[in-house]
Amino acid sequence: MSDSSYSDGAAAQSARGTAPRPEQAAPRLMLKGISKQYPAVRANDDVTLIVAPGEIHAVLGENGAGKSTLMKIIYGAVRPDAGEIQWEGETLEIASPAAARKLGIGMVFQHFSLFETLTVGENIALALDEPFDLKALAKRIREVSADYGLDIDPQRHVHSLTVGERQRVEIVRCLLQNPRLLIMDEPTSVLTPQAVRKLFATLRRLAAEGCSILYISHKLDEIQELCDTATVMRGGRVTGHVKPKEETHASLAQLMVGHSLPDYTRREHNPGEVLLDVKALSVTSDDPFGTSLDNVSFAVHAGEIFGIAGVSGNGQAELLSALSGEKRGASRQPADAIRICGKPAGRLGAGARRALGFGFVPEERLGRGAVPAMTLSENALLTAHRQKMVSSGWIRAGAMRAFAKRCIEAFDVRCGGAEALAQSLSGGNLQKYIVGREILQAPKVLVVAQPTWGVDVGAAAFIRQQLLDLSARGVAILVISEELEELFDICDRIAVLAGGRLSPVRATGATNAEEIGRWMAGLFGGREGTAPSAGHPAHV
């Protein structure tokens, strides 16, 4: 494919057309009576949805509400059992994603569909339905990445990318196809506040050119700022249509979950002794495209929640592996570079750190937090085997089931019981189980990565309250998250990791999202932190 095939923006705008006034426009997309039944659940039940040209339309609902199934039906990845799809006034069937793309429908999935052994450019090329030239495509990828504030190298192999960086690939891949309907599922979780504003400006420009946008997000402030209308789903059915700008956060949340959400219960912050102490930690990344840690120091006290913000790919993976015990020794750090409950732990393995009272919730739920094809009982064994689940080398299946049941009940995990497969749970329920599995072991120090990434507002509120309750019991908690709202909601102090360096530390009440956003771009300095050097670029 030639360069002009990718870079002719005027042609793309002409293809989308100028957005007509909503009252004059026939719907770009109309769904009537869409239903989809799976063996254990009715995912969609008589769903009707209308999206106009140039409209930014939100779809709201809890995990398991049927949003993802509906989007997959629109994109041709799932066939409905009943109902009618109209595209620009014509009744048709969307038999496959290729057919959807030919119509002009693009989708950014929350759960990624990338080949790990291929490069970014090769993965994007696979989504194109026409001949391509990898060199020209790489140039266009860089242009789009720069336009949208999505830092990604087309030559990198996907297996070397963090979760956040993989989402950037999905966004860029979709935008390269000049869609007439763009479906975006949680697209801003990897962006700084400044980059979110840039993305929103681009989406508004696309809408002004006539591109319709279906926007799925759990960030209610984003929906209120960006979206013209919203369809609310619960239990597979449409329960209402609203204009988000005329609603409050509380009313939108209540529409989603069917009841009002309780306010977070916080106690006065009276920090105790230091339970997690990191001093001058420098770790060389094993990944040639990774970000090495450079002289990172911080302390987390008993009864405190300490938050580290930052865009994915700035050393979070390296810090997490160093803290968890997965990476030790290779950094040639002294043993006391990491101290847990006063004990040198820098050269201890993961099991020895847990014996000191360390708990850990990884970023990836499926694959690291839980084995997809194993039951919840079996997954309990992964980190909680010290809870009398093993005796004289024998696994005690009854103890495993009892622990899993206790976790399910205590943390309101909605599933088919202790023998349900991990992969059968929604993201929110699996995350509640993984967090609960750690909390039930009564850790003294808990490190949590992305605790509510892709989780609905109900499950997110539950998880955050559990962390607040745990800190009130004297546990030292480190939360590494890209969700600024989350960090401001629950953290006592906050810092930013950018380019492998840690920013100054602030009391949460003494800073704001604008300052943290600048720090996420590497724009900080001073006695407690130094702006990233040329060798440690900040990924924004």
Task: Identify the residue ranges that each predicted region occupies.
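Glycine-rich phosphate-binding loops of nucleotide-dependent enzymes
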Residues: S2-V540
